[in-house]
Amino acid sequence: MTSNALLCFCSSQQLYADCCEPFHLKTKQPQTPEQLMRARYSAYAVKNAVFVRDSYAKEKQAENSISEIKDFATICCFVNLTVLDSGYDEDTGFVKFKAHYFYQDLYCELAEHSKFIKEDEQWRYLDGEITPVADIKVKRNDTCPCGSNKKYKKCHSV
């Protein structure tokens, strides 16, 4: 299936080709912190570690290696993104979100209030405050927590 027919991984209900893919291909730049947050989430889902690393603030790029980002993206299955709030002014912005993913047999939620800055006329992720959320251990015959109403073994089981 080509990206032209896929819904975007960022849960925007738009086609990937019209939503985050142009950012990943660098044919467009995110105009808001929320667009960048969605593009980062989708980049993890498609294992585009270079985009994720390049979207960090310059001061944070060295501590976030492409290989570590790729390793994390490869062992996880990203399920959905919920943006709760976002805003920005000329040079700073924020996005409050919940990202859901599977890591092995755990259903995980990353709840974060992310901070963004503008560098060289581009939005970049600076850092964020993470709200701890307990992971859920999922058994093969449990209903998948992604909301599909299928058994986990028939849905997201690796």
Locate the predicted segments by residue.
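Short beta-strand edge/turn micro-motifs at domain boundaries
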Residues: 111-137
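Surface-exposed, charged secondary-structure patches
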Residues: 73-109
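Cysteine-centered loop/knuckle micro-motif
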Residues: 18-20, 153-156
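Short Cys/His-rich zinc-binding micro-motifs
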Residues: 4-14, 138-149
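Short, low-complexity N-terminal intrinsically disordered segments enriched in polar/charged residues
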Residues: 1-39
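Short solvent-exposed beta->alpha transition segments
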Residues: 54-83
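Internal alpha/beta loop-helix hairpins
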Residues: 29-62
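Long C-terminal interaction/binding lobes of large macromolecular proteins
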Residues: 94-96, 107, 123-127, 142
